[in-house]
Amino acid sequence: MNKNPIYRSEEEAKNIACGNVAAELDENSQALDAINGAGWKQTIVCTIAQGTVGCLVSYGLGNGGYCCTYTVECSKTCNK
């Protein structure tokens, strides 16, 4: 029996507990394509909305106009 799950035959895949790994990966990629296939317009709108919400939360937490991350380099500039 081949140890690489991708290269197993159909008969070998039926005899293992996890089933056909290649078929499962294909199903997962199809599901991700369906989720991510909303179109570029919706993606742009979501990106702008998430950025706006992030800036509003940052401002609400006391950040005076800068959108910063938790990195050490940025934290020093945000505390001014």
UniProtKB/Swiss-Prot annotation:
**Function, in words:** Lanthionine-containing peptide antibiotic (lantibiotic) only active on Gram-positive bacteria in synergy with Flvbeta peptides, which are encoded by the same operon than Flvalpha.a. Shows antibacterial activity in synergy with Flvbeta.b, Flvbeta.c, Flvbeta.e and Flvbeta.g. Does not show antibacterial activity when tested with Flvbeta.a, Flvbeta.d, Flvbeta.f and Flvbeta.h. The bactericidal activity of lantibiotics is based on depolarization of energized bacterial cytoplasmic membranes, initiated by the formation of aqueous transmembrane pores.
Spell out the post-translational modification annotation for this entry. The lanthionine formed by Ser-58 and Cys-68 forms a putative lipid II binding motif. Maturation of FlvA1 peptides involves the enzymatic conversion of Thr, and Ser into dehydrated AA and the formation of thioether bonds with cysteines. Modifications are processed by the flavecin synthetase FlvM1. This is followed by membrane translocation and cleavage of the modified precursor.
Q: Propeptide residues?
A: 1-38
Query: Which biological processes are named by the entry's GO terms?
Result: defense response to bacterium; killing of cells of another organism
Protein's cellular compartments: Secreted
Print the keywords alphabetically. Antibiotic, Antimicrobial, Bacteriocin, Lantibiotic, Lipid-binding, Secreted, Thioether bond
A GO-annotated cellular component = extracellular region
In which domain of life is the source organism classified? Bacteria
Cross-link Lanthionine (Ser-Cys), where in sequence: S58-C68
The chain residues annotated with the modification 2,3-didehydrobutyrine are: T43, T47
Q: Where is this cross-link: Beta-methyllanthionine (Thr-Cys)?
A: T52-C55, T69-C74, T71-C78
Name of the protein in its database record: Lantibiotic Flvalpha.b
Extract the GO molecular function terms from the UniProt entry: lipid binding; signaling receptor binding
